[in-house]
Amino acid sequence: MKYSLPWLLTSSALVFSLHPLMAANTDLSSSDNYENGSSGSAAFTAKETSDASGTTYTLTSDVSITNVSAITPADKSCFTNTGGALSFVGADHSLVLQTIALTHDGAAINNTNTALSFSGFSSLLIDSAPATGTSGGKGAICVTNTEGGTATFTDNASVTLQKNTSEKDGAAVSAYSIDLAKTTTAALLDQNTSTKNGGALCSTANTTVQGNSGTVTFSSNTATDKGGGIYSKEKDSTLDANTGVVTFKSNTAKTGGAWSSDDNLALTGNTQVLFQENKTTGSAAQANNPEGCGGAICCYLATATDKTGLAISQNQEMSFTSNTTTANGGAIYATKCTLDGNTTLTFDQNTATAGCGGAIYTETEDFSLKGSTGTVTFSTNTAKTGGALYSKGNSSLTGNTNLLFSGNKATGPSNSSANQEGCGGAILSFLESASVSTKKGLWIEDNENVSLSGNTATVSGGAIYATKCALHGNTTLTFDGNTAETAGGAIYTETEDFTLTGSTGTVTFSTNTAKTAGALHTKGNTSFTKNKALVFSGNSATATATTTTDQEGCGGAILCNISESDIATKSLTLTENESLSFINNTAKRSGGGIYAPKCVISGSESINFDGNTAETSGGAIYSKNLSITANGPVSFTNNSGGKGGAIYIADSGELSLEAIDGDITFSGNRATEGTSTPNSIHLGAGAKITKLAAAPGHTIYFYDPITMEAPASGGTIEELVINPVVKAIVPPPQPKNGPIASVPVVPVAPANPNTGTIVFSSGKLPSQDASIPANTTTILNQKINLAGGNVVLKEGATLQVYSFTQQPDSTVFMDAGTTLETTTTNNTDGSIDLKNLSVNLDALDGKRMITIAVNSTSGGLKISGDLKFHNNEGSFYDNPGLKANLNLPFLDLSSTSGTVNLDDFNPIPSSMAAPDYGYQGSWTLVPKVGAGGKVTLVAEWQALGYTPKPELRATLVPNSLWNAYVNIHSIQQEIATAMSDAPSHPGIWIGGIGNAFHQDKQKENAGFRLISRGYIVGGSMTTPQEYTFAVAFSQLFGKSKDYVVSDIKSQVYAGSLCAQSSYVIPLHSSLRRHVLSKVLPELPGETPLVLHGQVSYGRNHHNMTTKLANNTQGKSDWDSHSFAVEVGGSLPVDLNYRYLTSYSPYVKLQVVSVNQKGFQEVAADPRIFDASHLVNVSIPMGLTFKHESAKPPSALLLTLGYAVDAYRDHPHCLTSLTNGTSWSTFATNLSRQAFFAEASGHLKLLHGLDCFASGSCELRSSSRSYNANCGTRYSF
């Protein structure tokens, strides 16, 4: 055979290239078992391999090698490999390497420079290799720490590495990289000890624990230096995609109690990971030195560029519990840290005993906690600084579902001089001054629920301490029960801005406590903007101040600590929030709710300060520059402060109040310095109100007085313009030839008239307070200029001003008992000039005077224009005192200088004309001049009677007589229909009735309507003499109303008797012609005459409800009785027309009488109605046309007629009030003439059974009446 050279070369190359892939295979069986002493051999023979292609040990049975104390050759491991990769294949058997007392690197296994792997074991146990106490032990497994020297545990059922010791790194495994994967039952690394790094595992590069479905446990491992459970030095290490429970418990090291990594470390996609009771033992850390840090995990990066640091993401449950460090990071220490997309995260009872970050510490780079879909809990963690979290870079908590920080503590000594020690009970976010401008600081954003409760700091920031802090776009934020011994019970920001914006749910600060700033302490710009609801409740600043130069004990809820030099650029702003509430906050010194040198509250929909307290000043707010403007309703209620029950303005400060989109109300506020007195605002020495304005339709209410320090002698008196007119802004004309783009566009703004109202009232004061003049007196030591709108003094209020000037487009309203006067202290020239004075009629009683007085030494009093009377409650002319003539002194005018100028004053008000309703009369005003030029105006009243208001007139009461008339008339009409064409046999019948009646309004009386319906039952019989008799009973239910304020529900019970007979009478030829003789035939010579009569009685019961003017109701009920008699006759004439079989002229006489009993209304101020009655006599006449048909047996009738009321006794009643005032109430009477039409029909259904129906309409010039009835009749 011949071979070519090319083939030979190719085959040779193939053989040599496959040679490294052909690993040597060695079986291990029970014959390889070893136990010292059992075989009589003192030494174990080392299993050495050096095949460059690698070695694979395959178990054919369970193998156990135990109690190895000596080995041959010496200085070897049980398994030593110096060649290619070394593999152990369990083939579903177990391998035990136990109590290996050897001191070679890797007592059980030593592999040089190549990979080591374990796979397919039912159980792999490496125990005590070497055992604890073995001198010079160097771990159980050692793989040379060079690239390629990996140790892999994969696809095993159980792996146990325990009680191994080493004087070097990694007591259980030391390798370049380590991979523990796909364990199906359990992996246990327990009680391994290294005097260097990695109590259980140590990798020069990375460690990977991934894809294990069984449990993985690192417990009670110890490293003298780094990583009690694992130490990984370089490259990315991962704990990834484990579906079994992964537990790190009770591991100990100087640094990184459970796991220490000097490169990126990722814990991702695991089902449940638990770090419990791990700890570090190193000394306190220095900057950029992690020694002693990370009770559970330490991830330290020498350089953070392009590094992710520690990443914990997409885990279902991650828990750090009871981990401890002696330095920083009770659970975690990381240069950079990200917690992303986890379901449940728990940090509980972790401790940094002498350092920062009880749960987490990040050194210089960013910290991020984001996208958690379950609950993230930081609870009862402890550190000297940052009880739960400490960060020196940006700290971002964003997009989480539920964040809970509770019971965490910063325990640093309260007198420590160290920076931030004892601060941040839950979170401390600190920025070095060099990085402040480029970093965000603490950023809590777009979370659904964030709760920080029960956290404690021994210095500042009970929950949060931050250099810079922003809370943005969260749904619900809760700060509850946090405590700081020094400042900021909930939050303390150090130097930079604080913002809380865009919260879509409720933000609550409640029951937080600190010596200063019960809830929030800031030093920079502080902004609360566009939040749905802000609630500050029950927060306390508890210190008792020992000096007056700092803010200790100030700011029950918020203290914005701005220096005097920063007021121009920094402030506390609360703007555009839907709801803002400060409730029951307390400060030992100033600012029960807010303490801020500069504060702006604007654009919010609803604001409430209630029940806040400050022992020194400013029950709700203490400020130097305060502006409250453009909000919805604003209320200050039940606040108290030593000075300034609601608001205190510091010396030389300014206050601006504008009610633009809602009212501002001060009520129930008190000043508690000395004796408790009503007080809304106190202005310190030199302080002033710069703006007091209300937009049209809105009011500022001062139910508690304002107080103000007296001006210094010779000092400048500032002007206060009330409701100033803001002029329209008109853009300037553009230059003719200039380019349009170069001209700035100035927006057009309309003039703002500010025509709202400022009210000073004592109406809500307790009677014991209102009886003391000082409690009802507002003092404004300013020159008041009322430019527009209204100033109202009511219910005993006094307004003291330096001077008062009124512009013509404004009005001063005053009640009896109120006072407008100038002050007396350091006031020499204060004057009062009124141009439009209006006096409240309701308050005039002849006892209390309206006082206008100038008390300055040289000022004058001038009143001009027309005096006006206003009637606030609209009830003055209902006062029974106006029944008689009166003389009422009501206006007292005086001036110390004696100058009272009334030259241009018209004291006969145009508004004093006789009213439309109430007591009638006329006024005359008489001025009386007394000593010193004092002028008293006396109002003289000449009484002329009483005119009730429409709601008191009650025309529906007499009109109910017409309702009874309509009802009884309709009953008789129904009986007439039922008796028409009645058979001669006895029978019974039943029918239904419906009525609708409307009467138009007349000049004095309201219109009314009636709707009633009911039923009627009757029977009839005919005597042999052809006399027909009938009897009937009926019941009706009615509703009527008067289109003003009253309505009546009625029930009617009625009985009727009816008789009918017919005769034939001869007619003379002159009587046979009639008005329609040209259309209808004349009457025959002998004509039948049909006579009928009816007598009816009805009892009517009425229940009336009246809506009275004071939003109450009056109830009445009474009875009335109806009597009706009707007699009449008709002359039926037969015809032979196809569609008209007969016609009948007729005439009737109807008499109706209704009598009504007197009654009294049930109401706060009841009316009494006397008895009344109605009598109406009418004569109806007309023609009835009839068409009869045999098939089917039926008859149709049409009646047209005219009626005149020949006699009427018009209904009316005497109406009285309990005070004796009375008037006559007349019914809205019907006109006397009526036209009516009725269509009716009868149809025979069966033998003895027929039905009937009719509909009619009666028209009068002022009323319409409609009736419909139907029924059926059975004849025996």
Curated annotation (Swiss-Prot):
Belongs to the PMP outer membrane protein family. InterPro entries: Autotransporte_beta, Autotransporte_beta_dom_sf, PbH1, Polymorphic_membr_middle, POMP_repeat. It is found in: Secreted, Cell wall; Cell outer membrane. The keyword Flavoprotein does not apply. This is Probable outer membrane protein pmp6. It comes from the Bacteria. Residues 1-23 form the signal peptide. Its main location: secreted. It comes from Chlamydia pneumoniae. The keyword Metal-binding does not apply. Keywords: Cell outer membrane, Cell wall, Membrane, Secreted, Signal, Transmembrane, Transmembrane beta strand. It is a peripheral membrane protein. One of its GO terms (cellular component) is extracellular region. Residues 981-1276 form the Autotransporter domain.
